[in-house]
Every structure is written in structure tokens, then in C-alpha cells.
Amino acid sequence: MAGLRPIPARLLPDAMVVRVPDGRGGFAEGVAVSHVRFARTQSVVDDGHRGADAGAGKVYVDALNSDGAFEVPAGSRVDIGGHSYLVAECRRCEDFNGHVHHWELTVR
């Protein structure tokens, strides 16, 4: 049985910079990962001072078509489109042969 096809590059229009925790309370130097997809879920706040925050969402990183792809640990920071997000969860999605197909990062 053949593995799953990679996520098409045309569906991966975004880029991000990943900073993993350095073990000393800070973050390591940023690593660029291009050809990812950021799907934002924006929350609205009605407090008279602001209408919306940067939101949260999911980042899809393809194992083959995302340049610089790696398994991003929870607790890392990712910068996408001028906003910085915390990686709350990294879910590894495998094909039928047990190889990594893509990762889904839950960010907030």
C-alpha cells in the first residue's frame, strides 16, 4: 500500500520562524520554516478597548513540502504574519506505513 501524498505546495502559502525553548527560561535562535499553512481562529473581545486579539489557530507543517520542517515541541514560540504564538500542542500525523506525513501545531 502506497503512503499518503504530501500536502500540495499550493495549499502551504505561509512561512514561520520557530524558537524552541533553550532550557534556561528563554528561547533558542529562530529557525525558518516555509510552505506551511496557518488557519486562524480569531476571538473577539468586547471590552471597549480592543475588538480582537491575535487569536489562535492551527499550523500545518508537511514533512515533505515544508522547507525546514521538524517536529516543533510544545512550549515553542512561532512567528507568523507579524504575530507571535505559543505552541500548545504538536500532533504528529503518520501515513499508513508509520512515516510522518505532517504535523499539526495548535497555537495561541
What is each residue range found by the language model?
Residues 1-13:
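N-terminal intrinsically disordered, low-complexity, charge/repeat-rich segments that act as generic
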Residues 9, 19-108:
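Short, conserved turn/kink motifs that form compact alpha/beta structural patches or helix kinks used as
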